[in-house]
Amino acid sequence: MTELAAVSFVYPDLDALAAETAKIAVLVPAEGTLNPGARRLNRLTKGAVARAVESAAFEKLKSGESLSLGYPAGMASDEVILVKLARNAKPLEARKAGAGLGKTLGKEGLLIWAAGLGQVAELAFGAALRAYRFDARKSKSEDALGPITVCATKRDEAEAAFADRRAVAEGVFFTRDLVNEPANVLTTTEFADRLTAMADLGLEVSVLEEADMEKLGMGALLGVGQGSESPSKIVVMKWMGGGDGAPFALVGKGVVFDTGGISIKPSAGMEDMTMDMGGAGVVAGVMRTLALRKAKANVVGLVGLVENMPDGKAQRPGDVVTSMKGDTIEVINTDAEGRLVLADVMWYAQEEFKPCAMIDLATLTGAIIIGLGHENAGVFSNSDDLSGAFLKAATAEGEGAWRMPMGPAYDKLIKSRVADIKNVGGRAAGSITAAQFLGRFVKDETPWCHLDIAGTASVSSATDYAPAGATGWGVRALDRLIRDGYEG
């Protein structure tokens, strides 16, 4: 797993600044008032800091943006970074500013003079999130990233506040690594092995093999993987830190590679379908976070791991499969496979654990990208309370999410002539009909949200908190949802 950059908190030491060899970042409010650290740097650089702060370039900066002074005279450091940020910055402002600094982290390390800032832990969290790179498959790794050292007036408070944030960041990195892995590395077996290894953190982990699923009647899931040499699996992760109450259930789609099956995808862009297990990756990251921070909550995470390949044994368009629930499904398009996987895993989750609520995540439809782009995940729900709580958590964490409509009028689009339901409708309302399909496998008494993360799980250009590639979207929001609403 990609390791977080080392983050530590120290008391401010003005006398140490001249000899510091790491990059040095100092916070300056919009009005340009220099704090003690900035004043010392200004003296050391013979007024260069003050001149930069008084410049038009600094004036044009938005909150959280920065201006860099390279190779300043009088300093051992090669770079001084001036960050425009108020002492009373809001949490997301501080986090975004930290992310901007984390992006610059190199082998020499980074010293952030944050004395007097209220949201020191958020600043450090942002820096840790952005200081990520995936080079596990390169023949030569880049130099290891140096440490992030944060100067804080209330050092002990900042360190304590960051402890849980460190756990979240580790969960995000775990998700990103899983989503970034190529499919010849992250097979269904390798994926299951990595999740099983989290038993070392205190999670209870079990694996359902194909024979187990056959006994349970999971024809929908098994049909997807029958054309692959990689065996289909369901991995169940349990964290029971909240007493005797019913658990919260997270369910993830884990298609480790999606060719589309017999309804094969165009070759252009098919290499990106290594990320089609993004929902399972998020579930894994959340469960890792909960275990690391010893959450006082009961949560079960279930992921359905399959590979969708064309083969002489592969599922065909027109096949009818029987789900664990007993509903029959006409497979119109074998490339609409994720909903078949989720249908059986969601039903199993409800039968086995009787959860107090359930959220599924999946890179499910291209239609959600057409509707919401890469800024927001689609939120579909049968519960205003659950969807509202999730949207509140996502907003607090700065993760884009937008609620989409559902309703019985859409059911006619997936009505089958030969089975109870078909797995895809026409072009109209594609993400909604996918959610309507999943809704058939949710019991009336189960509050449920479906998160379509096709546009947010992996992106082609860098975001505020991640380089191009896997983002880890959803780990932060789901951890906050559980923390705020489901912990004792």
From Swiss-Prot:
GO terms for cellular component: cytoplasm. The active site is at residues 265, 339. It catalyses: Release of an N-terminal amino acid, Xaa-|-Yaa-, in which Xaa is preferably Leu, but may be other amino acids including Pro although not Arg or Lys, and Yaa may be Pro. Amino acid amides and methyl esters are also readily hydrolyzed, but rates on arylamides are exceedingly low; Release of an N-terminal amino acid, preferentially leucine, but not glutamic or aspartic acids. It is an enzyme of class 3 (hydrolase). It is found in: Cytoplasm. SUPFAM superfamilies: Macro domain-like, Zn-dependent exopeptidases. GO terms for molecular function: manganese ion binding; metalloaminopeptidase activity. The keyword Transferase does not apply. Keywords: Aminopeptidase, Cytoplasm, Hydrolase, Manganese, Metal-binding, Protease. The keyword Nuclease does not apply. One of its GO terms (biological process) is proteolysis. It comes from the Bacteria. Binds 2 manganese ions per subunit. Its cofactor is Mn(2+). Mn(2+) 2 binds at residues 253, 258, 276, 337. InterPro entries: Leucine_aapep/pepB, Macro_dom-like, Peptidase_M17_C, Peptidase_M17_leu_NH2_pept, Peptidase_M17_N. Mn(2+) 1 binds at residues 258, 335, 337. Its main location: cytoplasm. Its EC number is 3.4.11.1, 3.4.11.10. Coiled coil: none annotated. Belongs to the peptidase M17 family. Presumably involved in the processing and regular turnover of intracellular proteins. Catalyzes the removal of unsubstituted N-terminal amino acids from various peptides. This is Probable cytosol aminopeptidase. It comes from Dinoroseobacter shibae (strain DSM 16493 / NCIMB 14021 / DFL 12). The gene is pepA.
